[in-house]
Amino acid sequence: MTEPQVLPDGARVVVAGLGVTGRAVVAALSGRAASVVTVDGRADDADVRDGDDPAVAQRVVAGADLVVASPGWAPSTPLLTAARAAGVPVWSEIELAWRLRVARAGARGPAPWLAVTGTNGKTTTVEMLASILTAAGLRAAAVGNVGTPVVEAAQDPSLDVLAVELSSFQLHHTLTTSFEAAAVLNVAADHLDWHGSLDAYVADKGRIYARAQVACVYNVADPRTEQLVRDADVTEGALAVGFTLGAPGPGQLGVVEDVLVDRAFHAEPGARDRQRTAAELGTLADLAHLAPGAVAGTGGTPVVPPHVVANALAAAALARAHGVPASAVRDGLRAFRPGAHRIARVRELDGVAWVDDSKATNAHAAAASLAAYAPGTVVWVAGGLAKGASFDALVADRADRLRAAVVIGVDQEPIRGALARHAPEIPVVAVDPGDTGSVMRRAVAAARDLARPGDTVLLAPAGASMDQFASYAQRGEAFATAVAEL
């Protein structure tokens, strides 16, 4: 495969955005680009702060050879619109990182990338994958949308392999990557305000499979993900590998009774027993610690939420594509601990559990979170920026889990309307969004009054946080602080 040119000689580069990603891009371009112009209306040290003015945007790109766009910059922004009109290439940070990769210490080439995208579960899956790779004795890091900019990690020669979380924003301007293996976990309507349509959103997710070398991992329960694999132009010999919560067929990973099994990578191609055998990767008991409040089911089998099992299978598939042994998959899953604000139990008080799942920033994620609890036992704290989404399917499918709901955020009407239509019998408290500083304390107080012993108060907002909080993390911290003050 011909490697793409790193940067044009004497390149004049415009960097759109000076957040964490943009600053990492600027650092990476130091000494490589002839000039760098930064554009960000919210950064005091940006070279250009009025890039949203179309006339200014045209002047900025007029002399540029390249624009590197941070994930938050939608294609419709004046700067990127002007770049396209002027014929100036636009790259994502991921595209730049791919072109700047350095060789591993003691190896011939750069570290391979194992990449994950999806509407939900990306961060958990990538962190699970990094845990598995580490258990196999590899120097691995979870990078990308999960935290550390990829452009930094790609230049670290000490890493053996990168576990890369990619959002649809990051994939939109990614053009030449060729991941060792890639996974799309699921696809549900999200970020339609950014992409313009569901079809455009799905297409950007599918970019992750382009030129995949070893495996394209898809969700058997989500036909869109399999179709993206079918449509992808991959490296010859790359496998299509499905994961399923049921018994796997050949070429799949799945669950038999309480055992996680691999029927995709367990034998050499052409092996005589390939169709009839499977490798054991662990059991559901190895995942029980990832479900706060999980109870034992029939025969003592731990009840692990389906989305947790699905994430583990996807991570296992990517690790197996890299050649990791089955024992390391088991050890990595046992050792894995999720990050903050992901189904994290913050307190139990008077028989009521308080759980922070602030990372559930859309309806699909909130549905998965609610599914983990018994019927009629959840006081649901929900709301935020709706991003143009509908909540009817979420409420209709999970109404049986709810005892009550507390609605926060500026986009309350979509959730309140869905609750009125599909769960009219449950009490709903709407928290006035006017006083942002006290919104979570008031929400927690309302939830306390609604909950009964044995219930769970679950913060699973189904919306983005930026209406009243700086991030989902700050929203979760505000929840935990308010609960601690009860």
Segments (PLM) and residue ranges:
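Nucleotide phosphate-binding/pyrophosphate-handling subdomain across enzymes
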Residues: 3-13, 24-28, 292-403
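Short internal beta-strands
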Residues: 37-40, 217-220, 379-382, 401-411
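C-terminal helical cap/extension that packs against the catalytic core
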Residues: 46, 392-455
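Residue-level signal for inorganic ion chemistry
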Residues: 29, 67, 116, 145, ...
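Extended acidic/charged loop-beta regions that coordinate divalent cations
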Residues: 40, 54-60, 107, 159-193, ...
